[in-house]
Protein backbone atom coordinates (compact mmCIF):
# COMPACT_ATOMS: atom_id res chain seq x y z
CA UNK A 1 0.00 0.00 0.00
CA UNK A 2 2.79 2.42 0.84
CA UNK A 3 4.44 1.67 -2.51
CA UNK A 4 1.20 2.44 -4.35
CA UNK A 5 0.79 5.67 -2.42
CA UNK A 6 4.29 6.77 -3.39
CA UNK A 7 3.58 6.16 -7.07
CA UNK A 8 0.29 8.03 -7.11
CA UNK A 9 1.42 10.99 -5.04
CA UNK A 10 0.92 14.14 -7.13
CA UNK A 11 3.12 16.53 -5.18
CA UNK A 12 6.86 15.95 -5.01
CA UNK A 13 8.58 17.61 -2.06
CA UNK A 14 11.85 18.88 -3.53
CA UNK A 15 14.52 19.71 -0.98
CA UNK A 16 15.72 22.70 -3.01
CA UNK A 17 14.16 25.20 -5.40
CA UNK A 18 17.33 25.00 -7.49
CA UNK A 19 18.11 22.14 -9.85
CA UNK A 20 21.63 22.67 -11.15
CA UNK A 21 22.89 20.78 -14.18
CA UNK A 22 26.28 19.24 -13.42
CA UNK A 23 28.99 18.39 -15.95
CA UNK A 24 32.09 16.38 -15.06
CA UNK A 25 34.43 17.88 -17.67
CA UNK A 26 32.93 20.93 -19.36
CA UNK A 27 29.65 22.54 -20.30
CA UNK A 28 28.35 24.65 -23.18
CA UNK A 29 25.15 26.68 -23.00
CA UNK A 30 23.85 28.80 -25.89
CA UNK A 31 20.53 29.94 -27.29
CA UNK A 32 20.66 27.47 -30.19
CA UNK A 33 21.37 23.74 -30.36
CA UNK A 34 23.61 24.01 -33.45
CA UNK A 35 25.85 26.53 -31.71
CA UNK A 36 25.93 24.45 -28.53
CA UNK A 37 27.00 21.36 -30.47
CA UNK A 38 29.78 23.30 -32.19
CA UNK A 39 31.12 24.59 -28.87
CA UNK A 40 30.97 21.08 -27.43
CA UNK A 41 32.94 19.61 -30.33
CA UNK A 42 35.64 22.29 -30.00
CA UNK A 43 36.13 21.45 -26.32
CA UNK A 44 36.01 17.73 -27.06
CA UNK A 45 38.90 18.02 -29.51
CA UNK A 46 41.08 19.86 -26.98
CA UNK A 47 40.21 23.51 -27.46
CA UNK A 48 39.97 25.78 -24.43
CA UNK A 49 37.02 27.85 -23.24
CA UNK A 50 37.96 30.83 -25.40
CA UNK A 51 38.22 28.61 -28.49
CA UNK A 52 34.72 27.33 -27.78
CA UNK A 53 33.36 30.84 -27.16
CA UNK A 54 34.77 32.10 -30.45
CA UNK A 55 33.41 29.13 -32.38
CA UNK A 56 30.02 29.59 -30.73
CA UNK A 57 30.03 33.31 -31.47
CA UNK A 58 30.41 32.76 -35.19
CA UNK A 59 27.93 29.88 -35.13
CA UNK A 60 25.31 32.17 -33.58
CA UNK A 61 25.95 34.62 -36.42
CA UNK A 62 24.59 31.87 -38.68
CA UNK A 63 21.70 30.44 -36.65
CA UNK A 64 20.58 33.38 -34.46
CA UNK A 65 20.53 36.33 -36.88
CA UNK A 66 18.48 38.59 -34.59
CA UNK A 67 21.10 38.61 -31.83
CA UNK A 68 24.22 36.71 -32.84
CA UNK A 69 25.08 38.47 -36.08
CA UNK A 70 28.47 39.78 -37.21
CA UNK A 71 27.08 43.31 -37.14
CA UNK A 72 26.75 43.41 -33.37
CA UNK A 73 29.08 43.89 -30.44
CA UNK A 74 29.60 42.87 -26.84
CA UNK A 75 31.90 42.16 -23.92
CA UNK A 76 33.84 39.13 -22.75
CA UNK A 77 35.35 38.13 -19.40
CA UNK A 78 38.18 35.58 -19.44
CA UNK A 79 39.48 33.80 -16.35
CA UNK A 80 42.92 32.17 -16.51
CA UNK A 81 43.19 29.41 -13.95
CA UNK A 82 47.00 29.31 -13.95
CA UNK A 83 47.44 32.99 -13.11
CA UNK A 84 44.00 33.52 -11.49
CA UNK A 85 43.77 36.66 -13.61
CA UNK A 86 40.56 37.97 -15.14
CA UNK A 87 40.76 39.87 -18.43
CA UNK A 88 37.88 41.82 -19.93
CA UNK A 89 37.53 42.85 -23.55
CA UNK A 90 35.20 45.62 -24.69
CA UNK A 91 34.03 45.12 -28.26
CA UNK A 92 30.87 47.18 -28.02
CA UNK A 93 29.73 48.67 -31.31
CA UNK A 94 30.96 52.24 -31.82
CA UNK A 95 29.16 55.27 -33.20
CA UNK A 96 30.49 56.54 -36.54
CA UNK A 97 32.56 59.72 -36.31
CA UNK A 98 29.86 61.74 -38.09
CA UNK A 99 27.05 60.70 -35.71
CA UNK A 100 25.88 63.31 -33.17
CA UNK A 101 23.73 62.74 -30.07
CA UNK A 102 21.18 65.39 -31.03
CA UNK A 103 20.18 63.33 -34.08
CA UNK A 104 18.38 60.84 -31.85
CA UNK A 105 16.60 63.02 -29.30
CA UNK A 106 13.36 64.13 -30.99
CA UNK A 107 12.24 61.02 -32.90
CA UNK A 108 11.79 57.76 -30.99
CA UNK A 109 11.67 55.68 -34.18
CA UNK A 110 15.02 57.08 -35.30
CA UNK A 111 16.53 55.67 -32.11
CA UNK A 112 15.46 52.14 -33.02
CA UNK A 113 15.17 51.60 -36.76
CA UNK A 114 17.03 52.32 -39.96
CA UNK A 115 20.61 52.83 -41.10
CA UNK A 116 21.03 56.02 -39.07
CA UNK A 117 21.21 54.02 -35.83
CA UNK A 118 23.70 51.47 -37.16
CA UNK A 119 27.02 51.48 -35.34
CA UNK A 120 30.41 50.17 -36.40
CA UNK A 121 30.26 46.43 -35.59
CA UNK A 122 32.57 45.10 -32.89
CA UNK A 123 31.83 41.37 -32.68
CA UNK A 124 34.40 40.22 -35.21
CA UNK A 125 37.19 42.34 -33.70
CA UNK A 126 36.37 41.25 -30.15
CA UNK A 127 36.15 37.54 -30.84
CA UNK A 128 39.34 37.58 -32.89
CA UNK A 129 41.20 39.53 -30.20
CA UNK A 130 40.11 37.00 -27.59
CA UNK A 131 41.28 34.17 -29.83
CA UNK A 132 44.61 35.78 -30.66
CA UNK A 133 45.50 36.42 -27.01
CA UNK A 134 43.87 33.46 -25.28
CA UNK A 135 42.94 30.78 -27.82
CA UNK A 136 44.82 27.58 -28.60
CA UNK A 137 43.38 26.15 -31.83
CA UNK A 138 43.77 27.81 -35.24
CA UNK A 139 41.15 30.30 -36.40
CA UNK A 140 40.27 28.29 -39.56
CA UNK A 141 39.65 25.27 -37.33
CA UNK A 142 37.29 27.26 -35.10
CA UNK A 143 35.31 28.84 -37.93
CA UNK A 144 35.06 25.79 -40.20
CA UNK A 145 31.82 24.51 -38.57
CA UNK A 146 30.11 27.89 -39.05
CA UNK A 147 31.29 28.14 -42.65
CA UNK A 148 29.79 24.73 -43.39
CA UNK A 149 26.60 25.47 -41.44
CA UNK A 150 25.97 28.66 -43.42
CA UNK A 151 26.76 26.98 -46.73
CA UNK A 152 24.83 23.73 -46.23
CA UNK A 153 22.01 25.27 -44.20
CA UNK A 154 20.19 24.47 -40.98
CA UNK A 155 16.65 23.65 -39.98
CA UNK A 156 14.54 26.74 -39.25
CA UNK A 157 13.22 26.67 -35.68
CA UNK A 158 9.83 27.79 -34.39
CA UNK A 159 11.69 30.57 -32.61
CA UNK A 160 13.26 31.98 -35.78
CA UNK A 161 9.98 31.74 -37.67
CA UNK A 162 8.14 33.52 -34.85
CA UNK A 163 10.70 36.32 -34.60
CA UNK A 164 10.57 36.96 -38.35
CA UNK A 165 6.77 37.15 -38.22
CA UNK A 166 6.85 39.37 -35.13
CA UNK A 167 9.32 41.82 -36.70
CA UNK A 168 7.95 41.65 -40.23
CA UNK A 169 6.91 45.31 -40.48
CA UNK A 170 10.39 46.69 -39.83
CA UNK A 171 12.22 43.83 -41.57
CA UNK A 172 10.35 44.39 -44.84
CA UNK A 173 11.59 47.99 -44.93
CA UNK A 174 15.03 46.65 -45.83
CA UNK A 175 15.31 45.01 -49.26
CA UNK A 176 18.18 42.73 -48.25
CA UNK A 177 16.30 41.41 -45.21
CA UNK A 178 13.14 41.10 -47.27
CA UNK A 179 14.81 38.90 -49.88
CA UNK A 180 16.77 36.86 -47.36
CA UNK A 181 14.11 36.01 -44.79
CA UNK A 182 10.78 36.15 -46.68
CA UNK A 183 9.29 34.47 -49.75
CA UNK A 184 7.48 36.15 -52.65
CA UNK A 185 4.26 36.11 -50.63
CA UNK A 186 6.12 37.93 -47.83
CA UNK A 187 5.85 34.92 -45.54
CA UNK A 188 8.83 34.24 -43.24
CA UNK A 189 11.09 31.21 -43.46
CA UNK A 190 9.00 28.12 -42.83
CA UNK A 191 9.56 25.98 -39.74
CA UNK A 192 11.80 22.96 -40.47
CA UNK A 193 12.76 24.29 -43.90
CA UNK A 194 16.50 24.38 -44.63
CA UNK A 195 17.95 27.90 -44.59
CA UNK A 196 21.19 28.39 -46.52
CA UNK A 197 23.36 31.53 -46.45
CA UNK A 198 26.11 31.19 -49.08
CA UNK A 199 27.26 34.82 -48.86
CA UNK A 200 27.60 34.62 -45.09
CA UNK A 201 29.56 31.41 -45.51
CA UNK A 202 32.00 33.19 -47.83
CA UNK A 203 32.27 36.13 -45.42
CA UNK A 204 33.19 33.90 -42.48
CA UNK A 205 35.59 31.98 -44.71
CA UNK A 206 37.41 35.22 -45.58
CA UNK A 207 37.66 36.06 -41.88
CA UNK A 208 39.02 32.59 -41.15
CA UNK A 209 41.76 33.00 -43.74
CA UNK A 210 42.66 36.69 -43.33
CA UNK A 211 41.56 37.66 -39.82
CA UNK A 212 40.34 41.09 -38.73
CA UNK A 213 41.50 42.84 -41.90
CA UNK A 214 39.12 40.73 -43.99
CA UNK A 215 36.13 42.30 -42.24
CA UNK A 216 37.28 45.82 -41.38
CA UNK A 217 39.19 46.59 -44.57
CA UNK A 218 38.70 45.81 -48.22
CA UNK A 219 35.60 44.40 -49.90
CA UNK A 220 33.45 43.66 -46.83
CA UNK A 221 34.15 47.02 -45.18
CA UNK A 222 33.37 48.80 -48.45
CA UNK A 223 30.07 46.96 -48.76
CA UNK A 224 29.07 47.91 -45.19
CA UNK A 225 30.04 51.56 -45.74
CA UNK A 226 28.26 51.77 -49.10
CA UNK A 227 25.11 50.18 -47.67
CA UNK A 228 25.13 52.64 -44.76
CA UNK A 229 25.89 55.85 -46.67
CA UNK A 230 23.44 55.14 -49.48
CA UNK A 231 20.60 54.65 -46.99
CA UNK A 232 21.03 57.61 -44.66
CA UNK A 233 23.65 56.13 -42.34
CA UNK A 234 27.10 57.45 -41.40
CA UNK A 235 29.46 54.45 -41.34
CA UNK A 236 32.50 55.05 -43.55
CA UNK A 237 35.43 52.85 -44.54
CA UNK A 238 37.54 54.96 -42.16
CA UNK A 239 35.15 54.14 -39.30
CA UNK A 240 35.52 50.45 -40.11
CA UNK A 241 39.30 50.39 -40.46
CA UNK A 242 39.88 52.38 -37.26
CA UNK A 243 37.75 50.14 -35.02
CA UNK A 244 39.62 48.34 -32.24
CA UNK A 245 38.45 46.06 -29.44
CA UNK A 246 39.99 47.17 -26.13
CA UNK A 247 40.95 45.63 -22.83
CA UNK A 248 39.17 47.26 -19.88
CA UNK A 249 39.78 47.00 -16.17
CA UNK A 250 37.15 44.66 -14.71
CA UNK A 251 35.08 45.62 -11.66
CA UNK A 252 35.59 43.56 -8.50
CA UNK A 253 33.71 43.23 -5.22
CA UNK A 254 33.10 40.59 -2.56
CA UNK A 255 29.80 38.97 -1.66
CA UNK A 256 29.45 36.73 1.40
CA UNK A 257 33.02 35.51 1.09
CA UNK A 258 33.04 35.19 -2.69
CA UNK A 259 35.06 37.35 -5.06
CA UNK A 260 32.78 38.71 -7.78
CA UNK A 261 34.33 39.99 -11.02
CA UNK A 262 32.36 41.57 -13.84
CA UNK A 263 32.67 43.90 -16.81
CA UNK A 264 33.36 47.57 -16.14
CA UNK A 265 32.29 50.61 -18.18
CA UNK A 266 31.32 51.03 -21.00
CA UNK A 267 29.05 48.17 -19.85
CA UNK A 268 26.56 49.31 -17.21
CA UNK A 269 25.07 45.97 -16.17
CA UNK A 270 28.13 44.84 -14.22
CA UNK A 271 28.17 47.98 -12.08
CA UNK A 272 24.48 47.62 -11.27
CA UNK A 273 24.99 43.95 -10.39
CA UNK A 274 27.79 44.67 -7.94
CA UNK A 275 25.88 47.51 -6.30
CA UNK A 276 22.87 45.22 -5.90
CA UNK A 277 24.97 42.49 -4.30
CA UNK A 278 26.54 44.98 -1.90
CA UNK A 279 23.06 46.08 -0.79
CA UNK A 280 21.79 42.51 -0.47
CA UNK A 281 24.74 41.54 1.72
CA UNK A 282 23.24 43.65 4.50
CA UNK A 283 20.19 41.37 4.71
CA UNK A 284 19.87 37.82 6.02
CA UNK A 285 18.21 36.20 3.01
CA UNK A 286 18.18 32.71 4.55
CA UNK A 287 16.11 33.91 7.49
CA UNK A 288 13.42 35.27 5.18
CA UNK A 289 12.64 31.77 3.87
CA UNK A 290 10.95 31.03 0.55
CA UNK A 291 8.51 33.79 -0.33
CA UNK A 292 7.48 35.96 -3.27
CA UNK A 293 9.70 38.88 -2.29
CA UNK A 294 12.80 36.68 -2.17
CA UNK A 295 12.02 35.02 -5.50
CA UNK A 296 11.73 38.39 -7.20
CA UNK A 297 15.06 39.70 -5.94
Residue ranges and their predicted role:
Residues 280-281:
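Extended active-site and interfacial segments that coordinate phosphate-rich ligands
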Residues 4-37, 41, 49-210, 215-217, ...:
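Noncatalytic scaffold domains of N-terminal-nucleophile
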Residues 295-297:
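Conserved small/polar residues in nucleotide/adenosyl-binding loops
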Amino acid sequence: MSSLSARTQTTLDYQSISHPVIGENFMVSTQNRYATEIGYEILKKGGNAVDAAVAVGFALAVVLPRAGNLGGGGFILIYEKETQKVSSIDYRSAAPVAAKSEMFISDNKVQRFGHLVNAVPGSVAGLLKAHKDHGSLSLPELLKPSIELAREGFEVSYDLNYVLEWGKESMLMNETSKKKFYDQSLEPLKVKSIFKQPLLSKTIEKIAMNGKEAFYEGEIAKWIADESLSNGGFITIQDMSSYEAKYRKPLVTSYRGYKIVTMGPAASGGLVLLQTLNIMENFDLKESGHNLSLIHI
